Amino acid sequence: MDNGDLYVAADGAIAPNPNASWLLHNFVNLKTIKFGNCFDTANVTDMHGMFHNCASLTSLDLSDFDTSNVTDMSGMFNYCASLTSLDLSGFDTSIVTSMRYMFFRCANLTNLNLSGFDASAVTEMDCMFYGCSSLTSLNLSSFNTSNVENMQWMFYNCSSLTSLDISGFRASKGTKTDLIFSGCNKLTDLQCSDSKILLEYKNR
């Protein structure tokens, strides 16, 4: 690592442990990370807090990560406050059960493409985008939330958010949706048909 830049390279494969939680957490001076083709995440099951508090990180491309066996992505990027560019286009999230706090306080993230995400196994989404105060629009129309038990504070204080598509969201009677839109004062374009979630929007 030099001047806050980290390049991961090796002659052979680098395979982290199945539990890769907190792998690079608190690398507060890290500005960029480049993962070479040698970084093999095929056997990883837990990415909880993997980049937690990488507070100086500005861009991150994880499009080559194999996440097909990952079940926990909670807090994966929380407190990455300087992050402006994040590429997760190759992510397979089909068996992920927890996305809670995943982008918590990513305050400078302006764009986020999660169109390839499969949320059908997810049970926890609370605080997922909490404090993403620079996001202006977000399309989560592909999300199937039929198994989600907790959505509390999901978009809390997304204060620049004007457009949000959650047309695929469904909240059961027992799903926690408290304060899901609290602080979303600029949100005027909401695509949603679920009555329980719409009530939270009305009362935000």
What is each model feature region?
Residues 1-204:
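Negatively charged
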